[in-house]
Amino acid sequence: MKRGKLWGRLVSAAGLSLSIFLSSIGNVSTAYAMESNDALVLDETKENTESATDASSNEASDAEADNDTDEAITDASSKELSAENDGASESDSSFDEYDHTALPETDEITVTAAGELSTAKAELYTLAPREAREADNSLVTRDSIHDGAILHAFCWSFNTIADNMADIADAGYTAVQTSPINECLSTNPGMNLHGPDGMWYYHYQPTDWVIGNYQLGSRDEFKHMCDVADEYGVAVIVDILPNHTTPSTGSIAKALMEAAGGSDALYHATGKIGGGYTDRLELTYYSMGGLPDVDTENTGFQQYFYEFLKDCVYLGADGFRIDTAKHISLPDDPVPSDYSDAGRNTFYPNMREALNEYSEEVGTKSYDELFVYGEVLQGTNDRLAAYQQYIGGTTASNYGSSLRSALSSGNLSVNRLLDYQIYDDTAYGSTYTADTEKLVTWVESHDNYMNDSESCWKSIDDDMVIMGWSIIAARDAGTPLFFSRPNNSSAENPYGDNLIGAAGSPIYKAPEVKAVNLFREKMGEADEYLSNPGGNIQTLMIERYNDTVQGAVIVNAAQTRTTISTETHLSDGIYPDQVEGSNSVFLVKDGVLSGSVEGEGVVVLSEKMDGTGKVVSFYNNKNWNGVVARVDNAEETLDTIDENDGWFQVTVLDDEFTIRFESADGKEVSPEFQITAESGTFATPDSSELYYSKAEAEEGLGIHTYPVYFFNTENWGSVYTYGWLDGGAQLFGGWPGTVAVNEGSGWYRADVKTTGEITAFNLIFNNGNGIQTVNVEGITPDSKDIYLAVDAEKSNGQLIVNRYEDKESAEKALGVSGSYTTAYFYNTEGWDKVCAYTWGATALGDWPGKELTQDEDGWYSVVLPAGPSEDLNIIFNNGNNGKQTNDMKISDMKYRFILNNGISYQKYGSKKDAMEAIAGAGDVTYETVYFYNEKADDANWKNVYLYVFGGTDGEYNNLVGTWPGKLMEKEEDSNG
C-alpha cells in the first residue's frame, strides 16, 4: 500500500488522547481517535462528517463570534470552517494559504433585461403564478412586524409551524421566520440537528431555488402554513440565501445552471477561491467558508432567483431574511477586473424592482410593504448602514454579543446596554446613515447557538434568554427576533430532542415572554428610558412613556430577590405585574416606584389601577420559621416576601390600616402596628414603634452592621462567609457560614451584624466545598481596608488575600473588573513582536490588532475595555507574520495568563502557575501519520490536510496548525 505521509508532533508523556481530521478543504474525512505512542494508518474517507472539536477555525473570528458559515460544507457546530474574520489576510488564514485555481474564463453570456424572459429560456424557469392574488389579512403589515416580535422557528417544518400558530399568536408574536425553504442538499438526508445524521446546515446549501425541501416540507405545505398564519394575523418571513450554493455542484439543478448560462457562469470567476473578511472585493466575489460564491450579478441568475421570491410572496410570504447579505455587492462596491461592466452590482436594486413589478402585475405586496432585512455580521468593512438603505434592515450582531456578555456576567449596566453599536458608512464617498429603527435584534441567533456554544448554551441558560429577550423586546428601537432553541435542550444536552421538523423549546411562549411581547405592542412608539434602580447594575429598568401610554419592564439578573425603590416616569398608582401567575404589585407614590423582583426574574408593568398603598417591612431578628402578615385583623393572612437579609415585606393596597406579623406556624406574634400616611413602614418584633428605614430600625434594636467585601476572582459558584469573635463566638453559625450577597462585577458582601460593642472580628471566605481563604483576622469596626482580594501569585493551598480600602484599588491591583480586563501573554517562542487582536465584547482594530510593549517582568499585557465574558475573544500574534495563538476566550476573572507550554497555547490562573507549567514541560516526541487516499482521482481530494485536536483541556487543538491543518506530503509513486 502506498501512502502519503506527514510528520506530526505529539507529546507522548502527556498520556492524553487526541483526534485528527483529514480533509481536502471542501471535504472532511472521519475523525480518528489516537492514543499517545500509537502509529496510525488511515484508509477510508467520508464526506461531510462533523468535527467533535471545539478548536478555533482561523486566526480571527467575527466581531459577533457567530459566523457566516452556518451553511458550510461540514456540520457547522464544529469550528473547522472559517469564521467571520476581521483580519484574515495573513498567510495561515483558513483557505487563503492554499493553492487554489480560479475558474476558467467563460464566454460572454447573452441575457435579457432584468424582469424579462426570452422564449428560449422561459422553459428553464419555474415561474411564479401570474393570476391576480387576493389581499392578505389587512392586519399583517410591515409596521405590524416592525413594531411587534418575530419568532425564529429554527428547523420547524411548515406543518409544525401551522400546528402551533395559535400558540405563536397567543404569545404575542406578529411574525414567524422559517428556516430556508428552498430545495437543498439531500445526499445524506438525516433529520437530526446534530451528530452523525445532524444535517440542519443542509438547508443552507441550496441546490435549486424552488420552494420545498425534504427537511421542512413541500410547496403545498408552505402555502398551507401561510394561509394559517394569515388567519391568525401572523406574518411569515422566509430565510433566503442567494449568495452561494452547496459545494456538491453535481447536485445543482440543471435548470438553474442553464438559466445562469452554464455551470461556470453561475459562479463568480473567483467564486471558488477562499476570500478574506476585510476587503470588500473578497467579501463579495470570493468563496466564503468553502461555499462557492454565486454570481448574483448575472442577470440570468437574477431572473431565476426573483421568480422564487415572487412565488414566495404569492403563496403568502410577508418578508425575507437574507442570509450572508454582506457577501453580496452593493452598487458602489468594487468590481473585479475579470468583468468589463463596472456597473454590474445590481442584485439588490433589481430585487426591489422585480418584486415591485410583480406587485403591480398580480397584486402581491410591494417591496416596501414587505419586511426585508439582511444578515450583516459586523466587522471591518461591513457597510451596515449602506445595506440598511438598499435592503431595508439589517441584523445587530454586536448588540447581541454585548447582551449575552452582560447576561453571563450579571452586569446589566445601562452604559453597557444602551448603545446599539452601529455606525454610518462613508466607504466610497457617499454617506449612509445608520438607523436603529432598521435593526433586527436578538439575544442569540441560530449561528450563535449551533456554531458558538461558548457564548450561548454553555453560558446562557433559558432564564437568561428570557431576561435578555425582555430587554430587547421592551426597548423602542429595532425589531426583536426570538431564536427557538431545540426542545428539551440544556447546557448538558444542548440539542435536546435533536430533531429537524419538530417544535422547539416552549420557552418562546413563557409567561414573561408573552407579557413583554404584549407590552411592546401596547407601547408602540413611546419614548424609552433605561436605568439601574438605586445604582444596582444587576437590575435594569426599561421605562416607556408618552402622552397616551406608560409602562416599565424590570429585569433582575441577580440570583436573589431585589427590592426596588426608585424614581420613575410612571404616574402615581398601583401597577400589578402582568406576567401570568405573578401576584406582585408595584406602587408609585410621589414619583417613586416601590416593589421587588425575584432572582433572575422579570416584571412587566403596563396597567395602572387607581389608588395607593404601602410597602411594610418587618425585621425577623428572632428567626421565626417564616413570616406572614395580618391586616386589620382579617381572617386571612398575607404572604410576605423574603428579602434575604433578615427583612420581610408585604404590599398593602391602602394608606391607613393596622398590621401585625406572625410566624408561619402561628406561634409567634408581633405587636400591632398602626400605619398612617405619615408613619414609618419598618417594624421589628421588639416594640410597636415604626421606623423610616432599615438602618434606623436596626439601630433602634442596638444592631450594628459592619460590611466586608470579597472579590471573587476564583470564580466560585457561591461565596460563603464564616466568622467569629476573638472569644470564639460564631457570627454566622457553623461552617461554612452564610451565603454572601452578590453585588455584581465579581464583588460579594458579608454583613456582620452584632448587638453591643465589639473590638474586632475574624472571617474566612470559602466556596462551601473545601476551598477557602486564610483567616482574615483583626477586622475592627473602624477598619477601612475591608475590600479583600486573593493574591494568586502568593497563594499555595489556602488562598492568601490582600486588603484594600475600596473596590477600585483592588481591581487595579489585579488588573480586572466588571468593566475592564487585563490579558497577559508570555513570549516563549521568541517572536520579534507581539500583537493582540480582539473581537466580540471589544475590538482593538483590524488584524493583527494592537502592538504591545514588554513589561518589566518579561510578560506582555493589554487592558481590554470590557469585563470577562464568553464573548471576550483574543488572539496574540507576531504581527501578521505567520505566528499566533488559537482563539482564546477571556471568560472569567482568573484565567487570563497565556503562553505556549510546549504542547499548545493555554490559559493559566496566575503568572506563577504559567511559569511552573513551562518548568514542568516534558520532552516532545514525534509520530508519523499515514493516510491512504481512496479518492485520489477526485479533484476535490487532490490535496489532503491533517488537523489535530483533543486532550483533556484542548491542549492538542491546532497542534499542527489551525483548520484545515497541515498539507500532507504525497509519497512518490503513490496514488496519494
UniProtKB/Swiss-Prot annotation:
Residues 1-33 form the signal peptide. This is Alpha-amylase. Residues 61-73, 87-96 have a biased composition (Acidic residues). GO terms for biological process: carbohydrate metabolic process. Ca(2+) binds at residues 243, 284, 293, 327. It catalyses: Endohydrolysis of (1->4)-alpha-D-glucosidic linkages in polysaccharides containing three or more (1->4)-alpha-linked D-glucose units. It comes from the Bacteria. Monomer. The active site is at 323 (nucleophile), 375 (proton donor). Residues 45-98 are annotated as: Disordered. Residues 50-60 have a biased composition (Low complexity). The keyword Signal applies. Binds 1 Ca(2+) ion per subunit. GO terms for molecular function: alpha-amylase activity; metal ion binding. It holds the Pfam family CBM26. Its EC number is 3.2.1.1. Belongs to the glycosyl hydrolase 13 family.
